[in-house]
Every structure is written in C-alpha cells, then in structure tokens.
A protein has these predicted regions:
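Bacterial N-terminal signal peptides that target proteins for export
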Residues: 1-9, 19
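N-terminal leader/targeting segments and the immediate start of mature chains
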Residues: 19-53, 60-62, 72, 167, ...
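Short, solvent-exposed helix-to-loop capping segments enriched in aromatics
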Residues: 37, 98-110
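Short, hydrophobic/aromatic-rich segments at coil-to-beta transitions
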Residues: 40-46, 61-68, 117-122, 140-147
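A generic structural motif
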Residues: 48-50, 68-70, 85-87, 124-126, ...
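An acidic-aromatic
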Residues: 52-103, 156-157
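Gly/Pro-enriched, hydrophobic low-complexity segments
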Residues: 112-188
C-alpha cells in the first residue's frame, strides 16, 4: 500500500525575511485558489503522476473523488469511505474518512510559510507530512502541477491537463466496490509502517 498511497496525493504550492508581506499575499492568493476549487460543482481532468503513470480524475462536490489509472488501479471516495484498489494484487484498502478534512484545502492547510511568484505557490513546514508543496495554477486558478516533497526527499508530482468543470457526473461513479474476491485492508492510512 505504501507505494500506492503517494499516487493518491492528487491535485504544488509555495518565505523568510520578506516573510510577513509575502506570507500574507501568498496566503490570500492561495485562499482564492482554494475558494475557486471549492466553488466547483464538479470537474474531470487527465493526470500524469511522476511523468509516467496516467489516469483520469473526477470530482463531485462534496468530497466525492474517483481516479482510474492506466494500470487499472483505482482511488475512489463517496465522501465517507476512501478505497484504494490494485487489480494486480487484488488488494483493496478501505479508509474511513470520519473526521478527516479533505480536498485541496485540507492538503494545503497548516503550512507555516506560504509564498507566491506569478502562478507558482510554495508552502513549507517542518511538521507536516509533506515538508514542501509546490502548486502551479492556470490563468483561471485551476491546478496545473502539484509537487509534494516529504522529509525523506521522496517527491510526488501530479500534472493536470484537459480540465473540464461543472460537468454532469453521476453519483454511481463514486460508490466503488472492489471485486468480492479482493483482500480488504481496513484503515491502511492509520497503520504505522
């Protein structure tokens, strides 16, 4: 599951002495981007993870997500349960989302340092799962690139293209059930490595 989890990190943000003004400007601009994403009823986009793995991500408010990768793996959430499914191993992770803040706002919140240069945001923190996040947005404040760097230097980069917003997405897409023959791992994100 560990190798699969960084790919979930779908959807790159962005600091010192000139700090307070940069941080406030960066936070304000970042909040505007998060507000834009939160205002969308739905979206669909093509994604490329680390320059290789491709897929399609679909989102419907509130908190419904479905990602189908080119290798058959699926990440899906109806807002209450998050599934990770790998058809090669027939293993499915089932994560209870009760009490979890999600979305772009959840990923980008709590960073001590936020700076912005043009359309590139940089967020840094020594206490977060990702020590650095870079977010590049388009002219209409939709994500183009999200790069997340952990303290062990592992980097996950997600590039978005062909984003379509406020499209009709049926609820059934987000009610994923793995094949009955799958091995289910309960709450894999709560387990210690």
């Amino acid at each position: 599951m560990r190798n699969f989890l960084p790919k979930f990190s779908i959807v790159l943000l962005f600091s010192v002495q000139t700090g307070i003004l940069w941080a406030e400007d960066g936070r304000d601009r970042l909040n505007a981007v998060i507000g834009k994403m939160n205002s969308l009823e739905s979206f669909r986009a093509s994604v490329t993870v680390n320059g290789g793995l491709t897929g399609v991500v679909s989102y419907k408010s509130p908190n419904q997500l479905h990602v189908r990768f080119s290798d058959g793996r699926i990440i899906s959430s109806n807002g209450r349960i998050l599934w990770f499914y790998n058809p090669d191993s027939s293993i499915a992770g089932k994560q209870d989302l009760k009490g979890v803040s999600g979305g772009l706002g959840g990923l980008l919140s709590g960073y001590e340092n936020v700076s912005v240069s043009g359309r590139t945001f940089r967020l840094t923190s020594n206490t977060k799962r990702y020590n650095e996040i870079i977010l590049v947005v388009s002219d209409n404040d939709l994500p183009r690139v999200l790069k997340m760097k952990r303290s062990d230097e592992e980097i996950t980069e997600v590039a978005f293209s062909g984003i379509a917003t406020n499209i009709g997405l049926g609820t059934g897409l987000f009610n994923f059930q793995p094949p009955t023959s799958s091995q289910i791992v309960e709450n894999p994100l709560n387990q210690k490595e």
